[in-house]
Regions:
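Asparagine-centered strand-capping/turn motif at beta-strand->loop junctions
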Residues: 29, 142-148, 286
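Beta-strand-rich N-terminal accessory domains
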Residues: 1-64, 211-212, 216-231, 274-292
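Short, hydrophobic/aromatic beta-strand segments
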Residues: 38-40, 150-156, 293
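Acidic/His-leaning functional-site neighborhoods
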Residues: 92, 197-274
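Active-site/ligand-binding surface loops and adjacent short beta/alpha elements
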Residues: 150-153, 157, 161-233
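Extended, loop-rich substrate-binding clefts of extracytoplasmic carbohydrate-active enzymes
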Residues: 4, 83-134
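Hot-dog-fold acyl-thioester-processing enzymes
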Residues: 48-91, 225-248
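Beta-strand-rich interaction surfaces with strong enrichment in secreted/lumenal proteins
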Residues: 58, 129-131, 268-272
Length: 293
């Protein structure tokens, strides 16, 4: 089924997908989790996102790779009620609210609303919207609206897995001098010195993060510019050898991705008043470094 020119619907493994193919890029989105699985600009026809070869694409578990939505909490259950990590948005079926095509750029809006199912995990009345713009760059916005009568607090992240050629030749630039909490060291506070080149398990929440950071991938001769707004944190994650403990990832997969996540996490959770909303947005643009000095 075709929704609009360049956007078609497909099904596999009991899941429904949107397949986007325009003159600027191709992409694939799972309605389960409202999850972007693939993004390939036509400028070089190279995949930008990493998706685990063992990802559950049947709705049984969250999908490993791509761009998961962590919402309405990021990380472990903040209330210690035994609820799953990273919230429930990545485990629910999202609705297609709108699809448009403007100047070869596809704009897709997905949505979730509070239901009896969501209230099993979280009692608040909400409306969640995710707008995905697919062209020569990838833009994503996540808007949370409080439809209830009392304020609520959320933390959230776009947990993006970027495909890299080799993690040891990958550097995150733009966080020098920024304080961070290191989960691998009991969330102790440190200050970033220089750029980040992971050489061991990395799990850091950067505080008061800048609006722009960059991933330099020397192995694939490209750089990824990340521009974010409405987000106070950047999370950098790579499991390193702990990948062997994850049943939806091969032991050596850590060498081929890095997560640089746009987030409002931990103490930077957002309180939304009744009738109010909050938007978090990120833009990803990839270019070649082949001619760089």
């Amino acid at each position: 089924m075709t929704l609009v020119d360049s956007i078609t619907v497909s099904e596999a493994g009991g899941l429904t997908f949107l397949d986007i193919e325009n003159d600027l890029a191709s992409a694939k989105i799972s309605l389960f989790g409202g999850h972007v699985l693939s993004y390939i600009p036509k400028s070089d026809n190279q995949e930008r996102l990493w998706l685990s070869p063992h990802a559950y694409l049947n709705g049984e578990r969250p999908i490993r790779g791509g761009i998961p939505v962590c919402w309405p909490w990021f990380g472990e259950d903040p209330s210690n009620l035994g609820r799953q990590a990273h919230g429930f948005a990545r485990n629910l079926l999202w609705n297609v609210l709108d699809c448009q095509l403007h100047d070869d750029i596809a704009e897709i809006t997905l949505g979730l609303e509070s239901t009896a199912t969501s209230k099993q995990w979280w009692p608040s009345e909400f409306r969640l919207r995710k707008k995905i713009v697919i062209g020569d760059q990838l833009d994503i916005s996540l808007t949370t609206e409080n439809r209830g009568e009392i304020p609520f607090s959320i933390s959230k992240a776009l947990h993006t897995y970027f495909l890299v050629g080799e993690i040891s030749q990958t550097t995150v630039v733009g966080l020098d001098g920024v304080d961070y909490l290191d989960k691998t060291l009991d969330f102790s506070k440190h200050t970033q010195v220089g750029d980040i080149t992971p050489f061991a398990e990395t799990d850091r929440v950067y505080l008061e993060s800048p609006a722009h950071v960059q991933i330099i991938d020397q192995s694939l001769s490209r750089k990824i510019d990340i521009e974010q707004s409405g987000a106070d944190n950047i999370v950098v994650w790579n499991p390193w050898t702990r990948a062997s403990l994850l049943n939806d990832m091969d032991a050596d997969d850590y060498g081929h991705f890095i997560c640089v996540e746009t987030a409002n996490a931990l103490a930077n959770s957002v309180i939304i008043a009744p009738g109010a909303s909050h938007q978090m947005q990120v833009k990803y643009n990839v270019s070649s470094t082949a001619s760089s000095p």
